[in-house]
C-alpha cells in the first residue's frame, strides 16, 4: 500500500538556555552514548527531506543533524514560540512536525498519528497527556505562521497559548506514555 502521508517538514527545537541542565545545551547532552539530538534525529530523518533545527548556539554541532539551522530573531533565548516562528518561516512543506530535542523516546507511530490527525482535521494537532496540552509534540499547518507572529507581536511568549488561539486537534496519550518523556534535567538522564 502506498504511503498516504503528505510531505512534512520536521522542526526540532534546540534553542533553549538549558537552565535545568546547569546551562548545558540539552540537545548535545549524552544519553546512552550519544547526544539527545541523535536519538530524535534517528526517528525523524526517514520522515522528511526537510529537517530544520532551531538552535541559538553550537550550530556547528547541530549541523550534522539538519538540512537547515535557524535561530531566534531576538537574542537572549526568548523561548519555543520564537523557535517555531523561525522554523515555520523556512519550512518547505505545508505541514510541520514540531518536537523538542530532549525527547529521545519519541517514535514514528506518535509522529504519524499526529500528522494523520492534523491532516484529517485540516488544523494543528497536539498531544494531550493527562488533560494537559504538550506543544512540544505537535504538527502545525504552515499557514498558522501569521497568527503566531501576531500573537508574538501582541506580547504572547507561550507556545501553547499561541497555538490554542487556533483550531487544534488533541491526540490523547496516557500519563505513563514514556514516548513523551523530556530529559530536561540531569536526574532524568538516569532513567
Swiss-Prot record:
BP GO terms, sorted: bis(molybdopterin guanine dinucleotide)molybdenum biosynthetic process
Gene Ontology cellular-component terms listed: cytoplasm
Keywords in alphabetical order: Cytoplasm, GTP-binding, Magnesium, Metal-binding, Molybdenum cofactor biosynthesis, Nucleotide-binding, Transferase
Zinc recorded as keyword: no
Keyword Ion transport appears in the UniProt entry: no
Record-level Gene Ontology MF annotations: GTP binding; metal ion binding; molybdenum cofactor guanylyltransferase activity
Domain notes for this protein: The N-terminal domain determines nucleotide recognition and specific binding, while the C-terminal domain determines the specific binding to the target protein.
Subunit structure: Monomer.
Protein's recorded name: Molybdenum cofactor guanylyltransferase
Annotated source species: Pseudomonas putida (strain ATCC 700007 / DSM 6899 / JCM 31910 / BCRC 17059 / LMG 24140 / F1)
